[in-house]
Each structure stands twice: as C-alpha cells, then as structure tokens.
Amino acid sequence: MMRIILFLLTNLAVVCVFGFILSFTKIPPESISGLLIFSSIFGFSGSIISLLMSKWIALKSVNGQVIYQPSNNTEQWLIDTINSQSKKMGIKTPTIAIYHAFDMNAFATGAYKNSALIAVSTGLLENMSYDEAEAVLAHEINHISNGDMVTMTLVQGIVNTFVIFISRIIAQFASSILSENREDNNSNRNTWVYIICSTILELIFGIFASIITMWFSRHREFYADAGSAKLVGRKKMISALQKLKLSYEPQEKSNIIAFCINGKHSSFLNLFMSHPSLDKRIQALYNRDYM
C-alpha cells in the first residue's frame, strides 16, 4: 500500500512541476497531452519489460544454475534457510540459483513477490560462514518482501517520462522561438533544431535522472540491511558486510550489479553508485538507522 501511495504522490508532484513549466511555454494543450502520453509509453515500457524478463535475463547474465534438487549439504542448507525466511516474511519461496563467481555476492530479482529469484555466487558460499550467508539471504528476502524491484521500476519509469517529456517540450519551445524570429519559416531547419536540442537535453536530464534513481537504490540497500538485522540479528548482518570488504571486486554485469548485495566499490562520483559504501552500511546498523 505504501508503495502505491508513494507512486501516486510522486506522479502528482511530477504533474505539478510539468504544469508549472508548461505555463510559460504557450504550447497548445492538445500537443502537451499527446506528448505526455508518448513520453509515458516510452518512459515506462522499457522498465516494465525489463522487470517482467528480469529473472530470465539475470540467470542468462550470470549463467546461473537453478537448484531443483539439492546435490550437497550446502545446497540443502541454502534451500532450508530461504524457505524458513520466506515463511517468516509471508512470501512464497523464491526460485534459488547458484552461479560461479570469485566475488562474494548474491542478488534478488523478479516482477512479483511470490515469483522471485535469489541467486548466490559460489564465492559467497565458499568464503562466508553460515551466519554471514544467512544474513545475506535475509537481505535479499527483504528486497523481495519490500517490493524493491517494482519500486525501482516505477521510479525509473517516472524519471524516464520526465526526461523525455521535458526535453521535447523545451526543444519544441526553442524551435517555435526560432521560427518566430526568422522571416523565412524553414521547416527542415526547425526540425533539425528540435531533434538536436531534444537529444542534447535528454542526455543532460538523463544524468540527473540517474542521480535520482541511484539515490533510491542506495536507500533501499540501507532498508534491506536493517530488515536483515531484524530477521537474523544485527551481529550477523554486520559480520556479513565486514566480510564483503574482503571480497574480490564484483564481476557481475552492469544490468545485474544494482540488484546485488555487494556493489561496485568507488570513492569517485558516489552520486552515481547504486550502493552506499560498506562502511556507511555498517555504521548505519551500529546506529540502528532505518530500523
């Protein structure tokens, strides 16, 4: 319910901003309506399709192997732990997969809470204790329970719509100003002005949109850490994050890394990082932030 309320409030805020900006453009309302529909379709379609295909894409990206029947004690423990945590959180047990990677990592994805996927790297299973791995799994279960994949899709769709819509409104406004200031109304020139202007603006606004989506992504990591601490204990979650500091740099592809518990490590351009630093996440748990 809170996710839907947040979505509606965000949309309302976006519409208000649109209305304020458009009041200065003098562009006909019918053009605005068509452009808004166009922007919404293109803004949300890519995000929604990616969400619906996320499990298949994720498994293909990491060459993950779904566990249908456990072949060893570790796989049996993995299934039992995820089953237990899923019941506690009131969701169906996700599909469980293992993929080969030297880095310690795991991720959750899927369009629905009751039809999700959790994949765990061999590096994590080989290097973490059961307590630490349990905390990582609880982190991923909380992502699923919180509906984070859907929330990120909604956020991405909204900012995509905003980028497309505002870019084309400003480009259309610039093109109309140019045609008014020239005696010869060259339609080809105006069209090129519109295309070039809208393309440049989409690139610029796209950068700011990335900052917004990455801010949401970083905050959902804090909440998933806190949820894991509530489920299995703060000590286990802190220990897991400390162990991740010893991991190889994550090797997962860019379309997967945002879903992983262990994101890319960088001290440069933190605004564009999908994950907070491990030190900040550990400190947040010590301070009981987000709990």
From Swiss-Prot:
One of its GO terms (biological process) is proteolysis. This is Protease HtpX. GO terms for molecular function: metalloendopeptidase activity; zinc ion binding. It is a multi-pass membrane protein. The gene is htpX. The chain crosses the membrane at residues 4-24, 32-52, 158-178, 192-212. Disulfide bonds: none annotated. InterPro entries: HtpX_protease, Pept_M48_protease_HtpX, Peptidase_M48. Its cofactor is Zn(2+). It is an enzyme of class 3 (hydrolase). Zn(2+) binds at residues 139, 143, 221.
